[in-house]
Each structure stands twice: as C-alpha cells, then as structure tokens.
Amino acid sequence: MESLQNHFLIAMPSLDDTFFERTVIYLCEHDEKGAMGLVINKPLGIEVNSLLEQMDLPAEQVSTDLALGAQVLMGGPVSQDRGFVLHTSQPYWANSTELSSGLMLTTSRDVLTAIGSERSPEKFIVALGYAGWSKNQLEQELADNSWLTIPADQALLFDVKHEDRWQQASRALGFDAWQLSSQAGHA
C-alpha cells in the first residue's frame, strides 16, 4: 500500500454525501490501520478569536487582528468538539507532530493561544473535528471513484480562498472537476 499522507483528497462531483460534497481533505495520516485528514474548505462561520473566547483561552499579545479573524474550519464529522491546528513548522512547538517538511499538526492549546502573536506559526488552519477512515475504507472509496488525489501543496492549503480550493485542486490535475462525468466505469 502506498501512503497518501501529505496528499489532498478531492471529492468527485458524483460524491453524493452532504458532508463531503465538493470537499478537499488534507491527509495527515494514512497507513495500514486507516487514515485521518482535515477538510480544508468548509468554514464554520466562527473566527479564531471567538473560538478562543468560548474556550476561555487568553490570546497572547496580539500583533495582528488578521490571524485572530481567520475562519475556523469544519475539519470533519468525527469528534467535532476536538480542535486541530495544522501549521507551518516552528522550532518551539514540542507538542506538534511533523507531518511533512514544513508542516505540523497539533491539538495543543499553546499553539492556539499564540496565534496572532510573535510566536504564531506563519500559516495555520484551525479545524474542529476530522475525517477518519478505518482499515481499507479509504482504499475502497478510491476504488469506487469517490476521490481524486494529488500531492499536498502549501499554497493551496494556506493561500487560496476556502471557497476556491475544490476548483483549484482539480485544476492542479489539469482539468476542471465539473467536466468529469458523474458516472464511473470499470474496465
């Protein structure tokens, strides 16, 4: 099995699931036990500063309102009360797990409270919940043509507007996702 960690899953236009329709998922883990990822294009309508207030977490000395005004994303349907921060690498985040060169994941509160301060990760995504697959489940969904995959790209992850990520991800494959047939065949 080839690991798809550090890849994007792009929902096929034919994917008939109200949660996953037109989603782009960053795969944080993928091994023989299953897979875990974060949906990166479904804002919850909550800003990071509001989330910090709801959690009674004091923000450090804020140097930019832009970071605290970032949207919290709906990371997936599993454990929606659990927060994840996907962020660019910083040397002082011991509780963050390195996923790839330059990208880390944490559930630690210290990164959340540092957002917007001098210690803030340069780029980040805050998400509630995650998408999870049991052993061989993702492989079956790929065989069923539910998803397309491409290597992850930090520009798409952090610099493209949420509402444009699905379209941009499909264009990275060289076509517009809407040009695909909703019917899949197997030869």
From Swiss-Prot:
GO annotation, cellular component aspect: cytosol
Pfam families hit by this protein: DUF179
SUPFAM superfamilies: VC0467-like
InterPro entries: AlgH-like
Domain of life: Bacteria
Family recorded in the similarity comment: Belongs to the UPF0301 (AlgH) family.
Name the UniProt record assigns to this protein: UPF0301 protein Shewana3_1200
Organism placement in taxonomy: Bacteria, Pseudomonadati, Pseudomonadota, Gammaproteobacteria, Alteromonadales
